[in-house]
Structures are given as C-alpha cells and as structure tokens.
Swiss-Prot record:
InterPro entries according to UniProt: DNA/RNA_pol_sf (IPR043502), Endo/exonu/phosph_ase_sf (IPR036691), Endo/exonuclease/phosphatase (IPR005135), RdDP_mobile_element (IPR052560), RT_dom (IPR000477)
Ranges in coiled-coil conformation: none
Protein name per Swiss-Prot or TrEMBL: Probable RNA-directed DNA polymerase from transposon BS
Alphabetic keyword roster: Nucleotidyltransferase, RNA-directed DNA polymerase, Transferase, Transposable element
Reaction(s) catalysed by this chain's protein: DNA(n) + a 2'-deoxyribonucleoside 5'-triphosphate = DNA(n+1) + diphosphate
EC numbers on record: 2.7.7.49
Record carries keyword Transferase: yes
Residue intervals of the Reverse transcriptase domain: 482-758
Keyword Cell membrane: no
Native species: Drosophila melanogaster
Encoding gene per record: RTase
PANTHER family on file: ENDO/EXONUCLEASE/PHOSPHATASE DOMAIN-CONTAINING PROTEIN, ENDONUCLEASE_EXONUCLEASE_PHOSPHATASE DOMAIN-CONTAINING PROTEIN
Length: 906
C-alpha cells in the first residue's frame, strides 16, 4: 500500500518556481499539493505536468498579484472540486478525494496577515468541510498548541475554533517560516488541521528543498487512494485476434429465430455478452501505469541538492551573511544544473519526434494534445442554487438540465397538434418491404469505420467490430434484418452516454455553458449507416430535400454554400443594388425536433415500412450523463434527433425539408432572392435598388417563417439573428428595421456564415485578419516545436506547419481568393515568418529560396491550385445550384477581381 502524500508550502510567488515544484512533486511522489500565496492575477494559471489545478484568487480592485491558493491533485486520483472562498481575508480551495478511509476533503488555506479574523469565521470554515477533512496552509497565526513560542490574537481565535469544532492539529512543532530579515523571529504558522483521520495514520515532516521563506511540509497518510479507471477497450494491442475469433465463434449459435421485439433484445444481449467474454479470455492483463516523468536527477544534481539543504540550515541558524551568500551560490548552481537537465531532456524528446510508424506517431500525438480543449472539472450550480458536491450530483444536475432541453416547445395550436396526430392514425399504403441487409454490405461498412471513435455504454468499439469473425457478422445480419422485418429497434441501442464539454468563454458553474456529446453503441451506428444509404437513395429519387439544403449531403460542402452567397452579393454590386440579408439562428434546433411531427413527415415522404422502423427508432430513447466514472439516473428524451448518430442529421433535414422558400408573395422580384441552408444555418439574401424595399421583402418572409416554425414547434433566436446590408455605397444605408417575434434585429457591418466572415463591401479583410490572428495563436502554441533552436528534424517541423497551421488559413481559400493582394498578403507574411523560424536561416536568404527548399507554395499559388480543383469539382457536381457557380465570363462593371479572374479566365 502506497501512502497518500500531501505537500503544504507557501510559495511566496510561484510563477518562477513551477518547474522546481514539478520536479520536487514527481521525485517525492507527492499526490496532492496545497500551495499558498501564489501571487497570481485572476485568470493566470500554473501548469504542473500530471496534476490538475484548482485555484482560489484574492480579489483586488486592480487585479493585483497578491495572495491566492491552489490545490494540485494528481490526475490519476479520483477527485472532485469543492467550494472556493475568495475574500480579502481568506482564500480557500478544496478538493474531495476518494481514499480507503472514504471521501476525504483536502483544502489549501491562506489567511492574510493584515486583516482581523475572528473565531466564528474559522469555525464556519472548518464546520463546512464536513466530517472527514484536512485543511493545510499558511494560517499566519501563532500559538503554543502547534509549537510556536508565543500566542498571537489570531492564534487564540483559531485555537478557540479548534476547541469548538473538535479538529486536531498536525504540525512539526518547530518553526516553518524563517524570515529573510534578521530582526524578525522564526515562527510556526504553516500546519494542518484535520478530522476523521486516525491519529496513527498521519505523520508530518519538513523539507529544505524548495526555495522560499517557508519550509515545505510533507504529510503522509497510510491509506489507499482510488484511481480513475479509464474506459477499457475490449480489443487492444494485447489481444490475440485469432483466439478472439475462435472464442467468439464458439459462443454464437446461428440456429435462432427472431420474430418479436423480445427475441431481438435477447439476441443483442447475447451478442454483446459473447463479445465481452471472448475479449476477456483473449486479452492479456496489463498492469496500470501511472503518469511517468522523464526527468531523472543525476548524481551531480543530488549532491548539489544535499549541499544546498546543509547550507540553508546553517544560514538560517547562524544568520551570518557569509553563510547566506554560500547558500545562494549553491541554490543558483543547482538551478543551473536543473535547467540544463530539463533542456537536455526536452531536446532529446524533440529529436525523437516524428510522424512515422517507427516513432509511434509521437509528433501527431503531441500536436493533438495541444489542440484539444483542456478539461477542468468545476462543480456546477444545481437548480436549488447549491453547488454539486460529487460526481453523482454533478451528473444528475446535468441530466436534469438536458431532460428539460430534450423536450419540444409548446407553440402549435390544439388544432395543429390534432391534425398531426390524425395523420399518424391514417392507414399506411401497401409497399414493398425494405431491401434486406446483405453480409457483404456489413463487411464493407465495417471496413470504412474509423478506429478513433469512443464506444457507447456497451463498450464495443469500432476496433472490436473490425475483429469480428464471419459467424458474428452473420449473427449481426440476422439481428439487422429482424429489426427491419419486425419494425422494432432494441432498447439497448437507444441508450446514450452523454459527456458534457465546456464552451470556452462561458461561466463554468452554469449547466447551459456545456455542450452535450453523445456516445452511442457502435453496433447501432453500423445499422444506421446501412439504413442511411437506403434513405439517401429514396430521397434522391423522390427529390425530398430542397436544392438549397447543402448540409450533410454527399458531394456538398460549406464552401459551395458560401460561394452562392458571395456570388449573389457580387452580382448586386455590379447591378448597383443593395443586398440585404438575414442570417437566422435556430434555437437548439436538433434537440427540440418534435417527434410526432417528424414521424408524420416520414410517413408522408417515405415508403410504409420505413415509417414503422423509424418510429421505433425514435420512441423511448434514453440517456445517462457520465462524469468521469459516475453515471446519472437514466432520463427520457422526449424530443430531438439522436445527437452523435448517423441518422440524426438526415432526419433533421427531412423535418425541415418543407422550409418556406421566398416567392412573389414575399418579394417583388423573387429571382433576386437567395435562400441558403446548411443543416440549421439559414441565410436569406435579397437585392434591390432600394434598401427599404429589400427590408420589406425580408420582413414578409420572416413572418411566413415564424408561422412555419410555430406550426412545427421550432424556435428562432432573435437575439442571435442578424440583418447586415451589403453595399458599395460610401454612406451607410439607413435600412428599415426588421422585426422577428417583436424583437428588432441587429444590423452589424459583417456576418459570419459557415466559418467565413462576410464584411459589408466583401473585401474579406476582417476574415483574413481574424484568420491570421488564429494562425499566430496556433504558432505560439507550437513555438516549442517550431522555434529556431528546436532540435526536431526539418522534415518534422515542415509537417507540423503544413498539417497544424496551414489548414487554418486554407479553409475557404476558394472564396476569399478574390480578395485584394493587400488583404491576403498578411497570410504570406505569416508563412514567411514560419519558414524562417523552421529553418533558422539568416536574414538575407530570400523567401523564394525558402519556398523552393521547403517545397511550399506561396499564397497566390495556393489560390490558383485550390480554385482550379474547385472549378473541376463544380463541373462534375450533381447539384444544379453548384454547377451554376461556374464563372460565365460576364461583362463586369467593377474592376475588382471576381471568381472568373481567380480561375485564370479573362
């Protein structure tokens, strides 16, 4: 049994000491760090490899870097953050850790020495920690109970609070602070108070390793700690695939009949259980490996560390300036050696990085971790106002929020509701059964599955599906065809595990600030792929989806849809017209889809057998929210298409297929209107010689759209719906305001649609400025890889730029390629700087030489290459709207560059 180690230390400013703390924590195998007096501004963070960071800042008017505490917890420990106290008097951060003694709360506390803290304040803080806790830090309180030579007023107040609460003291009994000023006396103000921990299990010692006027204290508690169990994969590199296939074939019997829903569910359980049993037998157990730290102290470093400890003790006891000088020299020499150790380790790691198989794709693993959004677990606020105290409460709080979200609005009238329900009661027309699923289809679909996908609750991932033997695939075909024949979807595949991802910039305590990510069964999504192919064929044959819908359709992309908008705007510029636009935001569109309304449209548009299958697929779907290893109580999804599924986007497109199109009722000339939809992103443009006439046409359409949304229980968010006007007029047009649900829409000078910023004059200057800013931010993240002194190979550096930086500005190059050279030249400057950082070349080396040696294209060459390929794709496009985007060499009034000139046409 490894004891749980806790560090208590006043850092006296941690910014320049973080690397020393990291090395100390890993070499001493410390599990929890209670660090006080960080002296960080609000928002500043400290990264210690292998530890999660939970701070509490001291409030100040000017956001000064004073006070503050933080708890660092090893990421492998199962823990949950608790309340935070941030006042001028006290800063406290708490984390609850699962141990062999039960849930134990660890808190870091810092009490400001210049303020008065009474006994009741200490009592309230200690009592709020629960029955089992350890609170350690810098109390700035002196008393003989914890080994000080005198009693201060705050010490007497704290001693009284400890007597009232029954908390015990854990201290060294000797001074923990040795001030730098010789006239000040040493004091014992760093210690811990605890409750619910047996006295014989906790010990405390002091160390002389870290540099501060406070000594670090190490507490050891003889108890086990509970570690986070990562979701185990059934088939790993330690699995004997041949043994797995043989074992699974022996467990599956094809002599079965599936003629009812109960039999289908039993077959699904049998298949899932057999896969688990076969994987358990054929996979070798692998011991859990904790977080490894690559830097190892050399013999020289250990000797210098011992020497520094000895000189520090002597300098503190003697208070001799010469002894202090020797101590500072030894500390400086040790810092230089440790800096060299870290530098050598870093250089070796960079030199070994590559994107090849032999290097284990170490380069891509490293860059992927940089792009991934950092996870910081924060307790959210429940509906009652209190904060969640553990993972189960957090999961159920999220589930309560999502259960409300997965409920359709109440907009339609009683007559409209009844009309939809009556349509569901009408008899179905005779139709041929759904085409059976062949084994060859399943095999081809499995081959195309991506490996890096998380499994659902059944833990059957895509790698497991790729290892299935022939007998298992035959059994799977029996289940799939039984679902089509019986028109029953098994309940096991209707359960979703939902992870909540924080939206950057949103308040962390609010459930609305998190985005749900659903994890569904891979067996279910494989069936959905096969059914989606059949549905797509029917939709193409019957032309169910409108041409203006480009979302989730084969051969359609965001670039073509934005191209339609820009071409319409440029035509309005040529015709000396205003182009008024409305960019519509649908509120929670996918999560609020009305099931009865969707099923009624499926019944009307598709053959009869699909009605029963999709009705069973949508009914009684459930979900559970997962927070680390804890799940919420199962909840019901009463509305919405399954998020994370294959059929979800397709069903949403079917649900919105009858979206109203602009016509003569709305506008004087509907030919000058353009409707563009990409899933739930809707844009409507209308050009006219009079900006107010264009506004009236848009207003009439929005009135019709609002009535359609009310009929099908969808909601438009007027706060996020905008009404820009595109024009080349030097004076800003005074357009008539447009209302939606009684709210006047904002009229900004630019709009962002599908990742492309469209400004008023369509110069793409704001878009290129924002894109360049994002590229510089990404290069700053990758600076440790792409700097001039990096030991990584030139080939690997080039690969990092090409695959991690260049795609940011290459997106939409077919559209913004018509911009003036002065606008996109900033991208070229960015690339030039990146090339010089990669190669570390002298200033006199020309940019053309760098482009040639690194085999990189200039921005102008990239524009020509991508637009040429784009033009070829448009010529072969099966959508008539996409083919119309091809330049027709029109007579242009303006001398500005258009799409035809970008493609090299006159």
């Amino acid at each position: 049994m490894n004891p749980l180690k806790i560090l208590i230390w006043n850092a006296n400013g941690i910014s320049r000491k973080a690397k020393d703390v990291e090395l100390f924590a890993h070499n001493k195998k410390v599990d929890i760090l209670l660090v006080t007096e960080l002296r960080l501004k609000r928002g500043e963070t400290v990264k210690i490899y292998g530890y999660a960071y939970y701070p509490a800042y001291r409030p100040s008017l000017n956001n000064n870097s004073v006070g503050g505490v933080a708890v660092f917890v090893r990421t492998t420990l199962r823990h949950f953050p608790q309340r935070v106290i941030e006042t001028r008097h006290i800063q406290l951060s708490s984390v609850k850790v699962a141990t062999g003694l039960g849930d134990l709360q660890f808190s870091a506390i810092y009490c400001s020495p210049s303020t008065r803290i009474e006994e009741r304040h200490f009592t309230d803080i200690i009592r709020a920690c629960g029955q089992r806790y350890l609170v350690g830090g810098d109390w700035n309180a002196r008393h003989w109970l914890w080994g000080d030579t005198c009693n201060s007023p705050r010490g007497r107040e704290l001693a009284e609070a400890l007597s009232v609460t029954g908390a015990k003291i854990l201290a060294t009994g000797s001074p923990t602070r040795y001030p730098y000023v010789p006239s000040h006396t040493p004091s014992c103000i760093d210690f811990a108070v605890y409750h619910g921990i047996p006295d014989h299990l906790a010990t405390i010692t002091q160390s002389w390793d870290l540099d501060s006027d406070h000594l670090p204290l190490i507490i050891s508690i003889e108890t086990d700690s509970t570690h986070v169990n990562p979701s185990p994969r059934l088939v790993t590199k330690h699995t004997d695939l041949l043994a797995f296939s043989r074992q699974l074939e022996s467990l599956i019997s094809l002599n079965t009949t599936l003629n009812s829903g109960e039999e289908i569910e039993m077959a699904v359980d049998n298949l899932t259980e057999s896969i688990h049993r076969a994987a358990a037998v054929s996979t070798s157990p692998v011991p859990r490996i904790g977080t490894t730290y690559g830097i190892v102290l050399t013999r020289e470093a250990r000797e210098l560390l011992t020497q520094k400890r000895r000189l520090r003790r002597r300098a503190i006891r003697s208070q001799d300036p010469w002894d202090r000088l020797l101590w500072n020299r030894a500390a400086k020499q040790l810092r230089n050696v440790l800096r060299e150790l870290r530098s050598n380790f870093f250089e070796q790691k960079l030199a070994s990085m590559d994107y090849t198989v032999d290097a284990g794709y170490s380069l891509w693993k490293c860059t992927k971790s940089l792009k991934r959004q950092p996870f910081r677990q924060v307790p959210i606020r429940c509906p009652g106002g209190e904060l969640a105290k553990n993972e189960e409460e957090q999961a159920n709080c999220f589930a309560n929020h999502l259960e409300t979200r997965f409920t359709h609005f109440q907009f339609a009238t009683t007559e409209q509701y009844q009309e939809t329900l009556d349509s569901l009661e009408t008899p179905l027309q005779m139709s041929l059964p759904i085409k059976p699923i062949r084994v060859e289809e399943i095999v081809e679909a499995i081959k195309s599955l991506p490996l890096k996908k998380s499994p659902g609750i059944d833990n059957v991932c895509n790698a497991t599906l790729k290892a299935l033997p022939v007998r298992a695939i035959l059994y799977l075909a029996l289940i799939y065809n039984a679902i089509l024949r019986v028109q029953f979807f098994p309940k096991q595949w209707k359960m979703a595990a939902i992870l909540m991802i924080h939206k950057p910039g949103k308040p962390e305590e609010s459930p609305e600030s998190y985005r749900p990510i659903s994890l569904l069964s891979s067996l279910s999504k494989l069936w959905e792929r096969l059914i989606a192919n059949r549905l797509n064929d029917i939709m193409t044959e019957r032309r169910i989806l409108p041409d203006h819908q480009f979302g989730f359709r084969q051969g359609h992309s965001t670039v073509e849809q934005v191209h339609r908008l820009t071409k319409h705007i440029l035509q309005a510029f040529d015709d000396k017209e205003y182009c008024n636009a409305v960019f519509i935001d649908m509120q929670q569109a996918f999560d609020r889809v009305w099931h009865d309304g969707l099923i009624s449209k499926v019944k009307k548009l598709f053959p009869a057998p699909y009605y029963g299958v999709l009705k069973s697929y949508l009914e009684d779907r459930r979900f559970m929210v997962r927070v680390r290893n804890s799940y919420s109580i199962p909840r019901v999804m009463r509305a919405g298409v399954p998020q994370g599924s294959v059929l979800g986007p397709l069903l949403y497109s079917v649900f919105t297929a009858d979206l109203p199109c602009p016509n003569a009722y709305h506008m004087a000339d509907p030919r000058k209107a353009l409707l563009a939809t990409y899933a739930d992103d809707i844009a409507l443009l209308y050009s006219s010689n009079c900006c107010n006439e264009a506004a009236r046409g848009l207003q009439e359409y929005l009135t019709t759209l609002a009535a359609w949304c009310k009929r099908w229980i969808l909601k438009v968010n007027p706060q996020k719906t905008i009404n820009p006007c595109f024009t080349l007029k030097t004076l800003s047009p005074v357009t008539a305001p447009i209302e939606l649900e009684g709210v006047i829409l904002d009229q900004p000078s630019q709009a962002k649609y599908l990742g492309i910023t469209l400004d008023k004059r369509l110069t793409f200057g704001p878009h290129l400025k924002a894109t360049t800013r994002r590229c510089y931010q990404r290069m700053q993240q990758l600076r440790w890889l792409l700097n001039r002194k990096s030991t990584m190979t030139l080939r690997a550096k080039r690969a990092v730029y090409v695959h991690c930086v260049a795609p940011i500005w290459l997106y939409g190059i077919q559209i913004w390629g018509i911009a003036a050279k002065s606008n996109y030249n900033r991208i070229q400057v960015l690339q030039n700087r990146a090339m010089r950082a990669i190669t570390d070349c002298p200033y006199y080396v020309r940019g053309t030489t760098l482009h040639r040696d690194l085999n990189l294209h200039t921005v102008e060459e990239q524009i020509s290459r991508h637009t040429s390929r784009y033009s070829d794709r448009l010529r072969r496009h099966h959508s008539i709207l996409a083919r119309r985007l091809l330049p027709a060499r029109p007579l242009r009034r303006l001398k500005r560059k258009g799409f035809a000139k970008t493609l090299g046409q006159p």
